[in-house]
A protein has these predicted regions:
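N-terminal and secondary-structure boundary signal
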Residues: 1-156
């Protein structure tokens, strides 16, 4: 069975701005029915490399974090370190990159936790059910420790 996909165009008008559209989209998709009360909620997104613009802006993350907090949840933004050398190869550089691109508790309304730790080795190996080529996946511990996982993604 195919998954439902919800879409909102990026046109804003005097009656509804983009953050209001995102809130309506989350409600329409059923996120308002999730029990967030006292739950740690991982909001996974890409913070972007320094100087790069291919990432969702912090105000989008703020909208999701506020939605979760209004329902009693404890949101945090997260991503894992990269395997390649760049601005996200370890947690310290990753946090600097996030801040340079505008992600911080003041702009997003929640903390940032790099899911796989300082050097990218804080992980949990989980089996991939029915995996033909990949039998196990290494998942960042903070993601595995979260009670709820929300993926806030972009496409190019």
């Amino acid at each position: 069975m195919a998954s439902k996909v919800y879409f909102a165009d990026l046109r804003a008008d005097m009656h509804e701005n983009l953050q209001q559209k995102l809130t309506r989209l989350m409600k329409t998709a059923g996120m308002g029915d999730i029990d967030f009360q006292d739950k740690f909620v991982a909001i996974k997104l890409h913070f972007g490399e320094p100087g790069n613009l291919a990432f969702l802006r912090p105000n989008w993350a703020r909208t999701v974090a506020d939605f979760v907090k209004e329902r009693g949840g404890k949101p945090f933004l997260t991503d894992c370190n990269t395997l390649y050398v760049g601005g996200r190869k370890n947690a310290l550089d990753h946090m600097d990159s996030a801040m340079l691109n505008g992600f911080n508790p003041m702009t997003t309304g929640c903390q940032i936790i790099i899911a796989d730790g300082l050097k990218g080795s804080d992980e949990v190996e989980v089996p991939v059910a029915g995996g033909e080529y990949v039998k196990n996946a290494k998942i960042g511990r903070a993601v595995m420790d979260a009670d709820v996982f929300i993926s806030l993604t972009h496409f190019k």
